Regions:
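Nudix hydrolase/Nudix homology domain
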Residues: 16-22, 32, 90-165
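Acidic/polar loop patches that form or flank catalytic/metal-binding clefts of enzymes
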Residues: 55, 86-88
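N-terminal strand-loop-strand
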Residues: 1-25, 52, 56-59
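Generic structural "secondary-structure junction" signal
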Residues: 9, 25-27, 32, 62, ...
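Active-site-adjacent beta-strand/loop module that shapes the phosphate/pyrophosphate-binding cleft
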Residues: 2-5, 62-86, 101, 117-125
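The catalytic Nudix box helix
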Residues: 25-57, 77
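Extracytoplasmic/secreted proteins and extracellular or luminal domains
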Residues: 50, 69-70, 89-92
Length: 165
C-alpha cells in the first residue's frame, strides 16, 4: 500500500469454482526453498511489475481439505512499493490497478475475506521477519514475531546479506 492509501489489486483471467474473477490482492505459491518475504516480493513483481519491499505478515489463514486432502496456509504480506508503475502479466491477469483502500473495503464486488485481510493490514503492524540465534541458519529458517521482541537478546532482525541455496 502506498502512503496515499492506494492498494495494488489484480483481477485474474480465470475465476475459481466457475465464479467470475473479482479484484483481489496479487499472490501465488512459494518456490521450493524460498523465504516468505522473498516470495511475496517476487509474486507481486511477476503479476504487476511493481517492485516492493516486504515489511511484515498482516495475517494468515489455514484451510483444511484444500487440495489432495491437504491443508493450505495463505499469508498476507504488507509491502512498501518502490514505484507505482504497473507492467501487468497478461498470461494470468486481466486487470491490475492502484485502488483507494476505502473504495476496496467499501465495494460490494469485493469478497468479505479480501476486505478483512486488508483491514488486518491497515490496523496492525503485523509480525516481522526475524531470526532466533542458535537455531539453524537464516538460509533454512525464518521466524515471524512482533517487532518489539526483536531486541538483540537472542531474537535479531532477519539478515539480508546471506546466500540462499
Amino acid at each position: 500500500m502506498t502512503p496515499e492509501r492506494d492498494l495494488l489489486v489484480v483481477r485474474e483471467k480465470f475465476g475459481v469454482g466457475g465464479r467470475e474473477p473479482t479484484l483481489k490482492l496479487p499472490g501465488g505459491a512459494l518456490l521450493a526453498g524460498e523465504h516468505l518475504g522473498q516470495a511475496v516480493e517476487r509474486e507481486v513483481l511477476e503479476e504487476t511489475g511493481v517492485k516492493a519491499v516486504f515489511e511484515s505478515i498482516a495475517c494468515f489463514r489455514q484451510w483444511h481439505g484444500y487440495r489432495y486432502g491437504k491443508s493450505d496456509i495463505y499469508f498476507v504480506g504488507k509491502l512498501r512499493p518502490l514505484s507505482k508503475e504497473i507492467t501487468m502479466q497478461t498470461a494470468e491477469i486481466q486487470e491490475c490497478l492502484w485502488m483507494p483502500v476505502d473504495d476496496f473495503i467499501g465495494s460490494d464486488a469485493i469478497s468479505n475475506f479480501n476486505k478483512q485481510i486488508v483491514r488486518a493490514a491497515l490496523e496492525s503492524d503485523g509480525i516481522v521477519q526475524s531470526f532466533i540465534e542458535g537455531f539453524g541458519g537464516p538460509e533454512s529458517r525464518e521466524y515471524f514475531m512482533p517487532k518489539h521482541l526483536i531486541d538483540g537478546s537472542g531474537v535479531v532482525p532477519f539478515p539480508t546479506d546471506f546466500s540462499q541455496s
